[in-house]
Amino acid sequence: MGDAKEAGAEGPPAGAAAREGLSLLSQAESEESSAQGSALFLGGNEVKSRAVVKYSSAPPRTAFARLEEKTDLKLPPANWLRESAKLGPAGTTILGNSKKSKPFSSFGMAYDFIDSVGNDVDVVSDSENIKKLLKIPYSKSHVSMAVHRIGRTLLLDELDIQELFMRSSQTGDWTWLKEFYQRLIDQKWQRKKKSKEHWYQKAILSKFLYYSINGDGAAQPVSSTTEQQESSSSDQTNDSEGASWPAPFEMPSSVSEDPSASSQGLKNDFVRNILWTFEDIHMLVGSNMPIFGGGRYPAVSLRLRDNNKPINVLTGIDYWLDNLICNVPELVMCFHVNGIVQKYEMIKTEEIPNLENSNFSTKVIKDIAQNILSFLKSNCTKEGHTYWLFKASGSDIVKLYDLTTLCEETEDKYQNPFTMPVAILLYKVACNMMMKKNQNKKHYGTIRTLLLNCLKLLDKSRHPQIIASANYMLSELFQLDEPKKEENSESPLNENSDESYSEEEEEMPDSDENGSYSTSSDPSDDSNAVAIIKSVGELSVPEKYKSIHQIRPSCAFPVCHDTEERCRLVLSYVLEGLKSVDSSIKKESDLPAADPSTPIPLKYEDESSRGGPEGLEKQMALFLDKMGSLQKGNYSSQSGMIPGSWQHKMKLQLILKSSKAYYVLSDAAMSLQKYGRALRYIKLALQSHDTYCCLCTNMLSEVLLFLSQYLTLCGDIQLMLAQNANNRAAHLEEFHYRTKEDQEILHSLHRESSCQGFAWATDLSTDLESQLSVSCKCYEATNEILQFSDLKSQNPEHYVQVLKRMGNIRNEIGVFYMNQAAALQSERVVSKSVSAAEQQLWKKSFSCFEKGIHNFESIEDATNAALLLCNTGRLMRICAQAHCGAGDEFKREFSPEEGLYYNKAIDYYLKALRSLGTRDIHPAVWDSVNWELSTTYFTMATLQQDYAPLSRKAQEQIEKEVSEAMMKSLKYCDVDSVSARQPLCQYRAATIHHRLASMYHSCLRNQLGDEHLRKQHRVLADLHYSKAAKLFQLLKDAPCELLRVQLERVAFAEFQMTSQNSNVGKLKTLSGALNIMVRTEHAFQLIQKELIEELGQPKSGDAAVAADASPSLNREEVMKLLSIFESRLSFLLLQSIKLLSSTKKKTSNNIEDDAVLKTNKHIYSQLLRATANKTATLLERINVIIHLLGQLAAGSAASSNAVQ
């Protein structure tokens, strides 16, 4: 590339005068403006032009030598056709003696300026082609150009029909186009040789330019013999232009990407590449025009004209456009007569359109440019297709053909020599867009279209590297980790525009060029043409072909409605890429043996100059490095891939992509609860990863992170399968299903590896313990990966999630072993000792809980740590239950082992509460732990009370321990908070109070001596009975418990009455006992209600009703309690009657006592009659009791009122 100084030197001096609507900016100014991003318009009202030299290989500009008058240009100068220091390496090119530009010149430029292709530039072409297009309305000569579309950029190249047909005669290629062309012009094709005059004019021009750079030593003629040789050499050079055409795709696949292909003309041969903006058209133009400078003329173009032939319009346009494209403000014209120099004339670029005999409108040229571009944009719609813009010599009709479509009808569609360069360019543009870090996702549709069109053009067997890479890039376009937000596609463009064009005609100036093609009738109704301009005159009409179309068809990214569809699309591209890689891998045994008689060609060509498919390896390597650099292994794979080869690198990336896609599919299946399918996909993901590991020894941290994610998901799936054992058959069926695509990808993986590295994690077991164990191993493996790499610190959130899962699975396994131990315990009936199997299960369960607690504590997850501590407490309670005496119930005592394990359980529950800190952190868990702690204290106290260890401890000590445990149980039993557990808490509290009251009642009965202690026990018993009754009164489903408490209270009153001596004290106690009896009415009402509901149920026993109904009463218990109640009520009433009667004899006129006595006698007589009726049903007996209690309550109330 030329440096900035060279590029800047191409511009004219600042402040160049503006005349007739055109002005030019210096190169420095235009570059500066471009950098600032502001639009600069050159010229006044007619046209705007701006040129920026992007590249220049020209040497520093030197002043031209003004030749003396009468200099004979027919004599060659001494330096003719020789290199010169003033010319630099491109000397002959600068001076116009090179061959004409190669057929692929636009591709060479496109490769060099890949950033501009597809978006920024409308046209890439040789300046000669641009000029030829803009002169169409003025010229009768033929036009034959190949047009290709890449994104919104059109590539224009000359399509030399003569050369093609010469090639066809020699090789048999392109016969289809030859036949088509002959049908088109309706006559045999004949090649016309260029005239002697043509070669004479070229030689004169060449000698003139050499004289102009040779300075004082210019006019040094050489011998006529030398001149003839040089001239002959020049003619031969010019006449052999055909060698620049590449061979079509006829080479065997083994050499299809050989470096020698770079000689096919894909290099950028131009001295200058210029970004030319003409009005609103942005063009990348290649130019070889010699530019002189220095002294008075900083930048001029030099032209030679025959003084006898005036400049015509075509020549004027030619000169004007050349100067405009190269930003040259002046033209120096040297006039000669028969090769003898006459004079020089300086012309400003702006003055050229107004020269005599060469008058043309710059505005019309602008209209022609805009119309031609619009015409091509509207009709060259298919990316990758080769279009042929053709105008026969002398014709006014311009036609556009789609050669790709015509070629596809032939036997070998790869006969089109443009196919490969177009495919490479499509690939390079896509690759360039992909490698841009900040590439907006909205361009993904464009990239995808470029790549798909590239793939359409390539033969799979001949270009596996590009095909594999393109497929990989297609797979990279789809974001697997998040749903793709689709953007609305733009309205699709009409690919084959059949607009009717205007048929107006106008006279055009005669051409001064002799056409080498025969004029044909050119019927305008050619069915093979994509589009037709019926008259070149239409091109001069402003906005005649104003494009209403977009440059490209809709490139919207495909809408994938769900994750599976997106992943399947990715996997289809991955599979195609893998197939390409696999097909290109040949083991040494398959390679042909070297023939000793055949020389091995040595290639000395510079690597950097490559332009064909062989030059893509460097670009692909860059792309792969961009996506994640690879560490090379030092071994060969099973398939024979060489580490570091393109196959090795590409297969690694494709395999990694497949593993990601399968992981996302597995995750999606997991969310749909399709666990069998999820396990199948994660198995494929891990098999892909295993193959990756086999190919790549040094693992990247990114890949290790993927593996940790795969194993985490695998652990999740195994856990869910363990928890959903009911659908095992369905899961199994889904797990074993395989699509054809999956099988083919797996086949490619098996070429490199056995894929068994993670088989332990992906087997679908029917054993619950095995599934839980595998899940745990997956999480443990993930934890190890994160621990022994930098990933733990780089991905703290992922690490926390893994530890949470480890804690959770260890809890699950702990619970599993704990439940197994409990099951064994329930089966153990005869044996008194704990079995070794039970103890082993306890150890396993405890170990899992302990590790899980450690996992949660390490990430400060207090809630889950508390839950696991709670489960450990439950395990301790199971251990305690296992140690209870299994012999005779009457001889059983609460054992020290039971006490030990219950106290351990209490310790774990208290740790859980400490872990939570306060209820605010997690109220539900806090309440649950409190309940379990209360239950443990209650169970331990109950067992100590029921099976008092009197052989080891004194009665008083046991009573004290029971009392303390019961009070602690009450402390952790929340009866006030409204929740689903509140009735249970109330029942528990009532039961505790009942048991404490019973215990103090029993102590009072059995205790002699210490009156203070007896009084304390009496008070405590009364207090707890009262609290128990109140709490049972709140419950709707505990009438029997309430009745029992009240009967015990009555018994307690009776016991107190035995120690009383005075009748008054006894009457008071009896009155209190009868009041307790009255308060049992609520319990009897509840029993009555349930009995009535039972009777109301249909005899057939509707299952649904039975299910919804509350648990039926224990009739046996109710009858037992009722009998006790009847006997105690009868006893109390009788005692009351006796005491009141004896009191009445001693004292008279006590109205209250009389009323009570009367009421009690009446109730007592009714009770005796009721109890005597042995045929009465339970409900009838209850009804009688409720009735009697009502009378008793009414009598008590009446007596109270009388007293008042």
From Swiss-Prot:
Keyword Nucleus assigned: yes
Alphabetic keyword roster: Activator, Nucleus, Repeat, TPR repeat, Transcription, Transcription regulation
Pfam families, alphabetized: EDRF1_N, TPR_EDRF1
Bias-annotated ranges (Acidic residues): 496-513
Coiled-coil ranges from the UniProt annotation: none
GO cellular component terms given for this protein: nucleus
Residue stretches spanning the membrane: none
Biased composition (Low complexity): 9-30, 223-241, 253-263
Keyword Repeat among record annotations: yes
TPR repeats: 693-726, 920-953
Major place of residence: nucleus
Source superkingdom: Eukaryota
Ranges for region Disordered: 1-30, 220-264, 483-527, 586-613
Biological process annotations from GO: positive regulation of DNA-templated transcription
Compartment annotation: Nucleus
Free-text function comment from the UniProt entry: Transcription factor involved in erythroid differentiation. Involved in transcriptional activation of the globin gene.
Protein name, UniProt field: Erythroid differentiation-related factor 1
Organism per entry: Pongo abelii
